[in-house]
């Protein structure tokens, strides 16, 4: 049976195919194997694959930026309700100026001052309040964003503090068996330190300014709490440190009193 197949290609076409089969594109490298069974697969280096991979970009708009939802919400409210937004700015500005004015009035009380004091107060308030009103009204969006950012940072900081305190309390509660001893030590601390403190306050209170002092009570309460926490977490830490400190100071005093001068030990050194 004879093969009647006749090639329709000219000898020049066959020669070009042989050349292109053996030539390698230095930029693209070797051609990868093409698997026609894969869905959506395209021949390598084909124009169709280039068109499929190309993503159209809008040169007029440029890259899109991630907008802040709070800014968009504020801008939308400003565009939809311009009168209410302006009234809100005016109300907040007047409220802030009023707070500053009445605070300064209560603190300074210009009615009890001399004429010079009244004039100085009037000039200061007359300059400060308009400047404050203009700054708050004109830069309303700027300082509101700054205040919101400060509130956000403060909230994050407080959340971290609460988390750290929770871990500390959890570790503290693990030492619950030390709490009765720590409480008794705090009670003893209040007896030993509280009685002399009360006597000194009643005797020398007018001279030292210790009578009915709020700072004194707060300091004493804080010290008691610190003693309770330290003795609960590490029992005996305060007692050991206090005894060591007292022993070290007593040893230094003994060394100072019993030290023999160098001249008395070596009288020949004077000659």
UniProtKB/Swiss-Prot annotation:
Residues 57-69 have a biased composition (Polar residues). One of its GO terms (cellular component) is cytoplasm. Coiled coil: none annotated. InterPro entries: WTF. Its main location: membrane. It is a multi-pass membrane protein. Keywords: Membrane, Transmembrane, Transmembrane helix, Vacuole. The keyword Transmembrane helix applies. Pfam families: WTF. It is found in: Spore membrane; Vacuole membrane. Belongs to the WTF family. This is Meiotic drive suppressor wtf35.
